[in-house]
Amino acid sequence: MSTAGKVIKCKAAVLWELKKPFSIEEVEVAPPKAQEVRIKMVAVGICGTDDHVVSGTMVTPLPAILGHEAAGIVESVGEGVTTVKPGDKVIPLAVPQCGKCRICKNPESNYCLKNDVSNPQGTLQDGTSRFTCRGKPIHHFLGISTFSQYTVVDENAVAKIDAASPLAKVCLIGCGFSTGYGSAVNVAKVTPGSTCAVFGLGGVGLSVVMGCKAAGAARIIAVDINKDKFAKAKELGATECINPQDYNKPIQEVLKEMTDGGVDFSFEVIGRLDTMMASLLCCHEACGTSVIVGVPPDSQNLSMNPMLLLTGRTWKGAVLGGFKSKECVPKLVADFMAKKFSLDALITHVLPFEKINDGFDLLHSGKSIRTILMF
């Protein structure tokens, strides 16, 4: 029996309040309005950004259905939708691509003005929600809310992908892999023969390592306080791995001594102010580029001496690795299908969706890189 045009009742993980476990609830998902798409989710990854919301580091309206790194199949479409149809395999896009705003028209940027990151409303682009639970509206997250068996997204926030692609793997292209890999190849523009330092070896950090290797870096120094992550980092391309706790001097000084004054490219992939500064300081004062990849704590500021930049350093950041989402995600999936890169090393655990809280426990313990939840 077709569900098109009808309210769907399904299971979703609702975050009712900060620093509490997710609650598996029955929610009602309204049909898509014009220019919207309803998706049946198949696989979703647990990303550190979701955990930043739970901890209060990243602010979004609650109660909400989180999740933003996923893949699924189109269930139905609203009026006027032309880029996807029911049955298509798709990846929802946490950063949309409307194609019309000044940012979408700028070849150097991907931070579409339709995003729900800068000033999160917790709704779709028309300002309303498609979710209700216990008779109350539930907020969306980044416009896609993938911790639900069904979700509704705007058409400019979904990309059709290869019909043969394995959704349990390519879901990582929705955030973690693209964010890390693109930070190296698009944002920093790592050059052949260069020296790189990567702070933080979670799924995104390891994807940065992969990007640095693909770009031809000669040295890739991986930095983490969890030495259990070093073997995987070396497998993916790190040439050296160091633990700041093994030294009695600041890690930026260690890195500068190792690299004749500083690395060419550094990446902070944790989301801490102290490591953002260490990452900046470890890149060469005359020619180094440091990229902020990790989501910083809300409402906290860094203070720094502008002389650090005057001498020639570049300090920059980007979301989703600088990729224009709707056009680049399908290309990345095609590259994966062509075996240009593998995602297997990033996936350490696969759990049923109902065990979402166990997946977050694995993240907190440092035992997982990426946990995939299957619906």
From Swiss-Prot:
CDD domains: alcohol_DH_class_I_II_IV. PROSITE patterns: ADH_ZINC. GO terms for biological process: alcohol metabolic process; retinoic acid metabolic process; retinol metabolic process. Keywords: Acetylation, Cytoplasm, Metal-binding, NAD, Oxidoreductase, Phosphoprotein, Zinc. InterPro entries: ADH-like_C, ADH-like_N, ADH_Zn_CS, GroES-like_sf, NAD(P)-bd_dom_sf, PKS_ER. Zn(2+) 1 binds at residues 47, 68, 175. It catalyses: a primary alcohol + NAD(+) = an aldehyde + NADH + H(+); a secondary alcohol + NAD(+) = a ketone + NADH + H(+); butan-1-ol + NAD(+) = butanal + NADH + H(+); 1-propanol + NAD(+) = propanal + NADH + H(+). Zn(2+) 2 binds at residues 98, 101, 104, 112. The modification N-acetylserine is found at residue 2. The modification Phosphoserine is found at residue 23. Belongs to the zinc-containing alcohol dehydrogenase family. This is Alcohol dehydrogenase 1A. It comes from Pongo abelii (Sumatran orangutan).
